[in-house]
Amino acid sequence: MSAATTADIDHYRTVLAGAFDDQVLEWTREAEARQRFPRELIEHLGARGVFSEKWCGGMLPDVGKLVELARALGRLSSAGIGVGVSLHDSAIAVLRRFGKSDYLRDICERAIAGQAVLCIGASEESGGSDLQIVRTEMSSRDGGFDIRGVKKFVSLSPIADHIMVVARSIDHDSASKHGNVALIAVPTSQASVQRPYAKVGAGPLDTAAVHIDTWVPADALVARAGTGLAAISWGLAHERMSIAGQIAASCQRAIGITLARMMTRRQFGRTLFEHQALRLRMADLQARVDLLQHGLNGIAAQGRLDLRAAAGVKVTAARLGEEVMSECMHIFGGAGYLVEETPLGRWWRDMKLARVGGGTDEVLWELVAAGMAADHGGYRSVVGASSA
């Protein structure tokens, strides 16, 4: 897949500018106050063409548009809203590539139009990110599949219509506890969504456990046993790229607002910005956020979704984002600690999700490590073949 042209990206930016209007800002403010995700926001973005324009090129994502949407979400400075929309879009990515039946295509098209909301049910209490040992079971019956299990962290499940469920097929080995991973779409109406969790941050991102004990038709199968990990990994790579883009934009907004504070707040006869230590600390953060933006642009220019690059840029962005929000909150001083006076405390709490959601730092570093290549020839040339 080729990278989007400048004209394509410019057009998509225009679409985003029209869609992310005052109504979206108001829904975001209300969502932060109510700690609930507004389904109408996804409906609005779908109706305004945000998803259809992004997916008009085919079954693979336009990475440039993926990054632009992520930046628009990041500028909202609401992790709950940003991650919620990107999870819906990541489920679309999975269906767009792997959903072959008319049933799945219909779900996908309705999700793109904003007429259906999607979520992903992967992690369980038993294994977290280790999806090889999922306990949710899938078995064939009557031209379809029985699905039984409990998913612990299913964001958007309280408002979603369909869950992309990671399950383990037990058709050929009922005692199996590892592997045979599949992916299947389950209507939320056929599952039991529990009470949403109280969380440290990202309040509007309604996240709950989901209990599943139902039957679905064969047409609901997204990825057969043995290919489910590949399918969900594709969706996770999409989500990781989005998280990185959201962080880049939210960090830039936080830095800009903090700089404004530094240029108006005076201590010891000078503005905070005139104090060299503070000014250079912010310059260091700005330089690294700029590098993150350039990295995202570089990945987008390749024109394809690269699983290893997505893992690397997400973990790097998450750790940088945590530092940026912490430093900005620090520079605000006591006001940064007052939740009714500034949003810095909320932004700081929200950013913690980035180091866990979509894969922890350690899981993502393992993906990066798996693709590293040793330079044996270079080693021999500088150290010598006989050295231990």
Swiss-Prot record:
EC numbers for this chain: 1.3.99.-
Pfam families, A to Z: Acyl-CoA_dh_1, Acyl-CoA_dh_M, Acyl-CoA_dh_N
Cofactor(s) the protein needs: FAD
GO cellular component, one term: cytoplasm
Keyword Zinc: no
Keywords: FAD, Flavoprotein, Oxidoreductase
Xref: InterPro entries: Acyl-CoA_dehydrogenase (IPR050741), Acyl-CoA_Oxase/DH_mid-dom (IPR006091), Acyl-CoA_Oxase/DH_mid-dom_sf (IPR046373), AcylCo_DH-like_C (IPR036250), AcylCo_DH/oxidase_C (IPR009075), AcylCoA_DH/ox_N (IPR013786), AcylCoA_DH/ox_N_sf (IPR037069), AcylCoA_DH/oxidase_NM_dom_sf (IPR009100)
GO molecular function, one term: acyl-CoA dehydrogenase activity
Family: Belongs to the acyl-CoA dehydrogenase family.
Protein's job: Catalyzes the dehydrogenation at the alpha-beta position of ACP-bound acyl chains. This results in the introduction of a double bond in the lipidic chain, which is further transferred to the epsilon-amino group of lysine residue in the mycobactin core by MbtK.
Protein name per UniProt: Acyl-[acyl-carrier-protein] dehydrogenase MbtN
Organism of provenance: Mycolicibacterium paratuberculosis (strain ATCC BAA-968 / K-10)
Gene assigned in the entry: mbtN
